[in-house]
Curated annotation (Swiss-Prot):
The keyword Ribosomal protein applies. GO terms for cellular component: ribonucleoprotein complex; ribosome. Residues 1-44 are annotated as: Disordered. This is Large ribosomal subunit protein bL34. Belongs to the bacterial ribosomal protein bL34 family. The keyword Ribosomal protein applies. InterPro entries: Ribosomal_bL34, Ribosomal_bL34_CS. One of its GO terms (biological process) is translation. GO terms for molecular function: structural constituent of ribosome. Residues 7-23, 30-44 have a biased composition (Basic residues). Keywords: Ribonucleoprotein, Ribosomal protein. It comes from Clostridium botulinum (strain Hall / ATCC 3502 / NCTC 13319 / Type A).
Length: 44
């Protein structure tokens, strides 16, 4: 067995980053909800 989480900064940004969220309407909804909730960090 090996560790399943192999962190990569670039991949994380690409998948869960701000620009990716802004591209889709559902992504923008996520950002809106997180702003509403008062999250300190909106995205990865």
């Amino acid at each position: 067995m090996f560790m399943t989480y192999q962190p990569k900064k670039r991949q994380r940004k690409k998948e869960h980053g701000f620009r990716k969220r802004m591209k889709t309407s559902s992504g923008r909804n996520i950002l809106r909800k997180r702003r509403q909730k008062g999250r300190k960090r909106l995205t990865a």
